[in-house]
From Swiss-Prot:
Coiled coil: none annotated. Belongs to the peptidase C1 family. The lineage of its organism: Eukaryota, Amoebozoa, Evosea, Eumycetozoa, Dictyostelia. PROSITE patterns: THIOL_PROTEASE_CYS, THIOL_PROTEASE_HIS. This is Cysteine proteinase 3. Gene3D superfamilies: Cysteine proteinases. Pfam families: Inhibitor_I29, Peptidase_C1.
């Protein structure tokens, strides 16, 4: 049973006695904010769900206030993930298995790349303006981010080569690339997906093979309806932002990042810089589609797969030339069409 607004108010009133003296806001401020947030995000809870979600919302409301009050150029807000604990968020939305590959060549060579010279001059490119990027998609509660990063880069290089931008099938990758090391909604790697597409001689379009937010037992690839092909792929030198930026001048690039922090979960605007980010423990696949500079702050334009209501209409500006913050150049790659 979903709760009515009246019953919600009753439950909130009953929870007053549990409010800690350490809370940042008054009971009424928490209450009003949560009700407004529920309405704007079309959220509805059962009786059992309500109080845990409300408690997590209050914690996130405090976190956002404390972060923003420090004057960071990264702005946080109460987005669609504001009723989730950080653990719940990581479990449901992150899924790049980068640690598998970092145990090999990339991790051993990471330290050799971080101190290479970086671009000093401002660089500006945005592949959205060149019709090489499809609209923001939504992976839902499935750790399929790697498949969206993969289709994004294949869509980009194909559009640049042919002049035609076609939305490609993430479901095709989810259902059919397990033999290449991917694990469906439990994560995978973009390079594994590239290997699958090469071996498979192509990928279906989103229209031909729609996304279902789950893995099917059967691969339903339509051999006679290939929408895009690639011949190979190139991996960026691990940790080398120079190499990543050179690649971005050519086409969009698939990147793996550390997105595990509350600051990423609740990102709303500004240039994202997280001092606690790891450059090796990577857990989310996204798509770098350009780069720019804002008031002296260099950034990458990064397309996420959490729908257009997250971040900057589905995008995030991530710090550029900041010692590979969040590992954005640790495991970057792009296909060759």
């Amino acid at each position: 049973m979903r709760l009515s607004i009246t019953l919600i108010f009753t439950l909130i009133v009953l929870s007053i006695s549990f409010i800690s003296a350490g809370n940042v806001f008054s009971h009424k401020q928490y209450q009003d904010s949560f009700i407004d947030w529920m309405r704007s995000n079309n959220k509805a809870y059962t009786h059992k769900e309500f109080m845990p979600r409300y408690e997590e919302f209050k914690k996130n409301m405090d976190y956002v206030h404390n972060w923003n009050s420090k004057g960071s150029k990264t702005v946080l807000g109460l987005n669609q993930h504001a009723d989730l604990s950080n653990e719940e968020y990581r479990l449901n939305y992150l899924g790049t298995r980068a640690h598998i590959k970092l145990n090999g060549y990339h991790k051993r060579n990471l330290g050799l790349r971080l101190n290479r010279p970086q671009f000093k001059q401002p660089l500006n490119v945005d592949w959205r303006e060149k019709d090489a990027v499809t609209p923001v998609k939504d992976q839902g509660q499935c750790g399929s981010c790697y498949s969206f990063s993969t289709t994004g880069s294949v869509e980009g290089v194909t559009a640049i080569k042919t002049g035609k931008l076609v939305s490609l099938s993430e479901q095709n990758i989810l259902d059919c690339s397990s033999s290449f090391g991917n694990e469906g909604c439990n994560g995978g790697l973009m390079t594994n997906a590239f290997e699958y597409i090469i071996k498979n001689n192509g990928l279906n379009s989103e229209e031909q093979y729609p996304y279902e937010m789950k893995v099917n037992d059967e691969c339903k690839f339509q051999e006679g309806s290939v929408a895009a092909k690639i011949t190979s792929y190139k991996e960026i030198e691990a940790g080398d932002e120079n190499d990543l930026q050179n690649a971005l001048l050519l086409n969009p690039v698939s990147v793996a990042i550390d997105a595990s922090h509350n600051s990423f979960q609740l990102y709303t605007a500004g240039v994202y810089y997280e001092p606690a980010c790891s450059s090796e423990d990577l857990d989310h696949g996204v798509l770098a589609v350009g780069m720019g500079t804002d008031n002296g702050e260099d950034y990458y334009i990064v397309k996420n797969s959490w729908g257009p209501s997250w971040g900057l209409n589905g995008y995030i500006h991530m710090a550029r030339n900041k010692d590979n913050n969040c590992g954005i150049s640790t495991m970057a790659s792009y296909p060759i069409a």
